[in-house]
Regions:
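A beta-strand signature from Gram-negative outer-membrane beta-barrel systems
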Residues: 125-167
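Outer-membrane beta-barrel translocator domains and adjoining extracellular loop/strand segments
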Residues: 180-181, 205-213, 274-283, 326-334, ...
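Structural signature of outer-membrane beta-barrel domains
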Residues: 43, 99, 111, 156, ...
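Short acidic/polar hinge/loop motifs at secondary-structure boundaries
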Residues: 101, 109-136
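Extracytoplasmic beta-strand/coil segments of soluble accessory domains associated
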Residues: 53, 69-110, 129
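Face-selective signature of the C-terminal outer-membrane beta-barrel domain
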Residues: 248-271, 290-431
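Short, acidic, small-residue-rich periplasmic hinge/interaction motif at the N-terminus
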Residues: 2-6, 15-62, 69
Length: 431
């Protein structure tokens, strides 16, 4: 035998004193390798696109206390403004645009009406494989009318046969954050995956402010001394607790002839947020809060080489059912010291126990046809329906009473694009 050749064995019988000449032929050892697939990273692909786009490699930030929103602040032109501690209201700006001008997607699926628990400042960085930021003009595949841009959270779809990822952190103001992700891909292609995370914080940090003092007389009436704004006190926040929990379950199959990926997922989230102040810091609330939950099933189907080679199909559908309650029913008035007196009317700001219900469903069809390595045609159609209803749960009868007109939005967006990419150094997109 020899290195690189097959081993050959032959039996030879010799009589005493006999000599025999034996010819031995050895053949080269050929080993058939499995299919080798060469791919480029999603981060590099986005950064080289013709769009004004940047991709952040989230894997480099895994197992840190960073959130998706915190990672986005590393992108030029992206600004984050939070009104307080953990779970506070957040505004994300892309080149000066915010609000409805900036849309959020997860794996290309729009997240309108997903609920406060899935705000970017509440989702841990481990949930994402990478974060794509498109500024201004966006690919037709998103099918959105966002003039400011799009943020697309891309999760890890190739985790391995079996995986487990978990993290926990504890910080100031009794802040707890935890995350766990586990799943398995079996030999027959069946897969399951579970993601779960939670955030909790008392948010009892100190503020420097003046205090509206009061005195309760013997007859029960309340006297208000003149407000002295020159006296500033160092006091703790006492009605600003926040917590949220979310679970994302997913089952499906991968690597089948009829589907490269078929996955059904179900998301559930809950949040509770106490409200310390209103627009003005000197107006303090001691019992006002907001809570809500969200249910969101979704379906994803992906097939390469559909009917003909180089024709890829992606179908997605999701439904978000989000319910939020704003509760302000206390008959007390508080100051920054946590002191209170009883009022003759209910409601620290405005008497309410309201319910807002969001129903949102989306369907996406996206087809890519590749001609060689340089030409790509993309067709996309997105249909969406959003409905919001609000009602109040107050009154002696404790019955639901409508107090606003339902808000309904329906959209159908189609797009067709062509991309020419003769090399990695330059490409052209038309749509």
């Amino acid at each position: 035998s020899a290195v690189g050749y097959q081993t050959v064995e032959k039996k030879v019988k010799l009589a005493k004193g006999e000599r025999i000449k034996v010819n031995v032929t050895i053949a080269p050892k050929v080993k058939e390798l499995g299919e080798v697939v060469v791919t480029t990273s999603g981060v590099g692909r986005v950064n080289k696109s013709a769009f004004n786009a940047v991709a952040v490699d989230a894997k480099k930030l895994h197992n840190s206390t960073q959130t998706l929103a915190g990672a986005l602040t590393k992108v030029p032109g992206v600004k984050l403004r939070e009104s307080g501690g953990v779970g506070s209201d957040m505004q994300l700006y892309i080149d000066g645009f915010s609000g409805r001008h900036v849309k959020i997607f997860i794996d290309g699926i729009p997240q309108e009406g997903a609920g406060a628990a899935f705000d970017l400042n509440n989702v841990p960085i481990n949930y994402a494989d990478r974060i794509e930021v498109y500024k201004g003009v966006v690919p037709v595949g998103f099918g959105t009318d966002a003039i400011g841009g799009v943020i697309n959270i891309v999760t890890n779809k190739q985790p391995g046969k079996w995986f487990l990822d978990a993290s926990y952190s504890y910080g100031s103001f009794n802040t707890h954050k935890s995350y766990v992700r586990f799943g398995q891909i079996f030999k027959n292609g069946f897969m399951y995956e579970v993601n779960a995370f939670q955030n909790f914080s008392d948010n009892d940090y100190y503020v420097d402010t003046y205090v509206r003092d009061f005195e309760i007389r013997e007859d029960g009436s309340v006297r208000f001394p003149p407000l002295d704004k020159s006296k500033i006190y160092h006091l703790k926040r006492f009605n600003d607790q926040y917590h949220n929990e979310a679970v994302i379950g997913k089952i499906g199959v991968v690597g089948k002839k009829w589907a490269d990926r078929l996955a059904l997922s179900f998301n559930y989230s809950y949040f509770y947020k106490e409200i310390q102040t209103g627009v003005y810091q000197d107006v303090v609330f001691g019992e006002k809060f907001r809570k809500g939950h969200s249910l969101a099933p979704s379906l994803e189907y992906y097939k390469k080489n559909l009917f003909v080679k180089n024709l890829d199909l992606l179908l997605t559908a999701n439904y978000n059912h989000n319910l939020t309650n704003n509760v302000d029913t206390a008959s007390r008035a508080y100051n920054w010291r946590g002191e209170f007196y009883e009022r003759g009317s209910r409601g620290e700001q405005s008497y309410q126990n309201s319910e807002s219900k969001n129903k949102n469903w989306n369907g996406t069809l996206r087809m890519n046809y590749h001609i060689g390595e340089a030409h790509t045609f993309t067709f996309s159609h997105v249909v969406s329906d959003f409905e919001r209803t609000s009602r109040s749960i107050i009154g002696a009868s404790s019955k639901f009473t409508d107090f606003s007109i339902p808000k309904i939005t329906r959209k159908n967006v189609s797009g067709l694009s062509y991309r020419l990419m003769p090399s990695d150094k330059w490409n052209i997109s038309a749509f």
